[in-house]
Amino acid sequence: VPLYAVNGQWINYEDTGGDLEPVVLAHGLLMDREMFAPQIAAAKAGCRFITWDARCHGDTENTADAFSYWDLADDLKGLLDHLGVERAVIGGMSQGGFVALRFALKYPERVSALVLMGTQAGIEDPEKVAMYQAMLDVWEAQGLNDQLARTIAAIILGNEWRGSDQWIAKWHQKPRSLLRQAFQTLVTRDDIQKRLGEIKAPTLVIHGTADAAIDIEKAQRMCSDLANCEQFVAIEGGGHACNLTHAKLVNLAIQQFLAGLELTAPQRAEQRANTIRADVERRSRERRDQSGPRRQTVAPVDRRLAERRALEERRAR
């Protein structure tokens, strides 16, 4: 895996190559570039994916005392410069979404579209900051015990996903010295909700309905405030990292969005209308299924009328 020196540290990245416009994906807190393996595996031929490890994650180590998500946006810009990529689809999950939004604000000319998964534009809720702080204190003081590991996995990956053990094993290997700064960057980030209208790039927002880290309402508000949020996809039962736990649904949403970027404006409008129509029909079917079979009221009435007419005819004879 190649490394590139940018802004004072070595950035670890992976470039699949391909003839199509690059799709650049940034991972979430405590994760790394490998979390997007399902999306890369499902991509059509020629699709180019660039994934990278942010500071304090994966094989990229932080060499500064402090950094912000704006700094990570600068890291991404330096990486794209190194690769000769002028414009790309910029995406991210959770923390990666924080970076993608700031990159779009700072370098709008480099963004052809955005893919935002399990993320938001606001700051962290105080009660969640306190919870994360307590978990961090235990991790730093005692190491990652099984109970804490399972709690973190439940927040990020849900309780039932079979791949959790792979990530727990990675967390056990993570140097404790990198935890504090990554956490500080998370909880001290600035609120950019009011600036979302400045982002003009077409955007896809994907969010799990069971996300324990970021409430889906925050993602819906983000989509509403973005200037060009073309589609909001709610992954039923999906948690925080639904691109891993519900990969097929997320892959389909991303593939359809990328295909739509190649269409003309009227074609894209028609595609959005068809998507909305299909979603309404799906929800209507789900409501019918949940309510059970409808009562048959018309047929029995018709049957009684027929029986009455038959009786009257017999009496007349």
Model-derived segments and spans:
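Conserved acidic catalytic loop of the alpha/beta-hydrolase fold
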Residues: 70-88
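Catalytic histidine-centered segment of alpha/beta-hydrolase-like enzymes
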Residues: 238-251
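Catalytic histidine neighborhood in serine/cysteine hydrolases
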Residues: 216, 220-241
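Short beta-strand/loop motif that positions the catalytic acidic residue
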Residues: 199, 205-207, 211
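Gly/Ala-rich beta-loop-alpha elbow adjacent to hydrolase catalytic centers
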Residues: 92, 96, 100
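Flexible "cap/lid" loop of the alpha/beta hydrolase fold
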Residues: 101-106, 111-142
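Conserved HGGG/HGGXW glycine-rich cap/lid loop of the alpha/beta-hydrolase fold
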Residues: 9-65
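Conserved alpha/beta-hydrolase catalytic His-Asp/Glu region
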Residues: 124-130, 144-197
